Amino acid sequence: MDIPLRTHATTTRDRPAVLRYSRTWDAGVSSIAEARDAVADLLARARPAPERRSVQDAQLVVSELVTNAAKHAPGPCALGLEVLPGARALRVIVTDTSREPPRRRPPDPRRVGGHGLHLVAMLARDLEVTWPAHGKRVTVTVPLTPRATG
């Protein structure tokens, strides 16, 4: 299921539009690149616009979480993105079919792979794992720094 990038709420003086994105994949590597592109597209519409480093951090977090879902869970995975009010943070929700909680492996600079959750922990906050009827949902919040103006 593909829900295109769009504004879901009406802009009023008291409440700005909420930017959201959601997508479900059957899994696979192509979903990772699409997820990174979705982050960039969504944040390009955020106001105030986040600085480039914040966009890259958000793309890395999403890439790691979607990679974990595609690698460790059989079946489809879903991605939800929501720019929080004032464009100060991006909420990221990744859902997959595995009931296994994500696990951080002990750091080992000689190991290839297995560093994704460490990166997520460095760049995001409020990591929460819940178990809906089928699988799990991982939610994090990535802080966004507004781009300097002038």
Residue ranges: model-predicted function:
Residues 17-37, 41:
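Short beta-to-alpha transition helix within the HATPase_c
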Residues 61, 66-72:
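Short, well-structured hydrophobic secondary-structure segments
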Residues 37-63:
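Conserved short strand/loop->alpha-helix "switch" segment adjacent to the catalytic nucleotide/phosphoryl-transfer site
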Residues 1-26, 70-150:
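Conserved beta-strand-loop-beta-strand hairpin that lines the nucleotide-binding pocket
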Residues 1, 14-16, 30, 34, ...:
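Polar low-complexity intrinsically disordered regions
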